[in-house]
Amino acid sequence: MNNVRQSAFARAYTSNILSIAYGKDILDILVAVLPCAWVYADYGYRLAAEFADTLDDNPYKSWVDMYKTDEFWQDSVWLLEHIEKLVADASEERKRELIDIFVTGVENEYMFWASAYDMQYTWKPKWNQER
C-alpha cells in the first residue's frame, strides 16, 4: 500500500473523529463513531443480501462478511442504546451539541461513500482541473 494517499473526504472524516477523541468526553466520542458503526452494519447486511450469489469472487468479500454479522449489528445497537442512556439526563444544549456531532458524522459518511463510489480520491478546484 505504498504511494496510497487517503482521500480528502476520508481525511476530513478521520480528522474530525480524532479531534473529538482528543478533546471531548466519552459521550462525544461514542456519538462521533455511531454513524460509521451504524452505516457499516447496514451496508454489510444489504450488500450480503443483494450480492449473495456473486460475493465469493469479490475482493470485498471479507469486508462484507465481517459487517454483515448479527454480532456487528448487535454491537451497533448496543452503542446506540448506551448513548441513549448516557444522554438521558443531559441538558437541551448538550443534546444539541451531540446532535451536531452526529449530523456531522452522517455528512462525513455520505461524502466518504460518495467519493469512493465516484472514485474521487483527490479534490481539485475547478481552476486546477485538467481540460
Please place each PLM-identified region on the residue numbering.
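Active-site-proximal alpha-helical scaffolds that flank and shape metal-associated catalytic sites
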Residues: 1-74, 107
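Structural signal for well-ordered, non-membrane alpha-helices
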Residues: 38-41, 45, 80, 84, ...
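Context-gated lysine
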Residues: 24, 61, 68, 85, ...
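Long amphipathic all-alpha helical oligomerization modules
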Residues: 69-103
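Acidic, carboxylate-rich catalytic segments that either coordinate divalent cations
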Residues: 98-131
